[in-house]
Amino acid sequence: MSIVVLKLPDVKVKSETRPTHCPSCQGEILQRWGGQVRRVRDPQVSSAQVYRYRCCRCRHTFRHYPAGVDQAQQSQRLRKLAALCWRLGLSYRGIAAVLAAFRVGISRMSAWRDAQEMAGQLKRRRIWKPVRVLGLDGAYVRAWGGVRPVLVAVDLGEKQPVAIGYVDEYNPQAVRRFLEPLVKRLGVSVIVTDDLVHYKTVAEKLGLEHQICQFHVRRWVGRTLKELNSGLPQEWLWVIDEIKKLMAELPLEGSKRFYELWKQIPIGRHGRMHQPLSALDQLRQLLLRLSEHWPQYRVFDWQPDVPWTNNGTEQVIGRMKMRSRTVRGYKTQPGLLNGLMLAGTSPE
């Protein structure tokens, strides 16, 4: 059984060091200018000694707090603990009840603000962190009286969410507006997505390598071949076996081979508009699609750090959906995006 250790910030009663410089002018000659005992909301510490210092250069005075204490009434440890409790499934009312058992009283709104603060810290921590391989996928969550679309971007190296946008993945213009700043800021060079055609269009416009999730590809190809197996003429069943072999081996020349197979299938729809496709016509379409998208199926083969599936993104979205089912519904767009960011982040 695996054990997860969650480290919370330490809270000191008194600062063990003096400040090294003035925050205004960076002056190094500082004079202690009084102090006071401040009450703190924390499970273990009830008060802390806060000193004020005066800079001898600019005469600016400032407070110097002990570790784990800042301007807020709650300690950093309590705020992180409240956000962690929400991440693990407690409601804001439940968080207040649990902390009351430790003789620390906070309101539901304080717990909500703690969760929003933690989500903001996660965003700021990752806003400039380089990401080479980015996973993208859409999700639908319950918010303000309906089901809302969101687009989730995940660092597939660390399996952590990077950004979440209120974007419909079926709108290529919106996807590009969401993705382009991330590409420029983080240095993204490869995206991993499902087989939705809009992602291919956006990747080409932004000059990105595009890996299509092999799980999605093999699933829809397998379903299509199963349907065609019963409708194809007997003399063309060997093509199905050839497709299965190519999908299993993923050879470099697969695109050329699919195109050769496509040219061998006779055209059977001349003059038959608005009629259902025959099994041979469906086979031709399948071969042409596989030939055109073959480079996007095997980027992982020549770039070792690119995964061949988008499972990392799916896992993050799974955590988001599990938490969204236990909340009453997000009321605002910022609350929705912050809640999903916090829920999708695995404990560090």
Regions found by a protein language model. Name each.
Residues 14-21, 48-51:
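Short metal-coordination and nucleic-acid-contact micro-motifs, chiefly zinc-binding Cys/His arrays
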Residues 23-27, 57:
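Short, cysteine/histidine-rich loop/knuckle motifs that typically chelate Zn2+
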Residues 54, 101-202, 209, 289, ...:
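RNase H-like nuclease fold core
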Residues 189-196, 200, 205, 234-348:
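Acidic/histidine-rich catalytic cores and adjacent linkers
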Residues 207-227:
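Inter-helix linker motif
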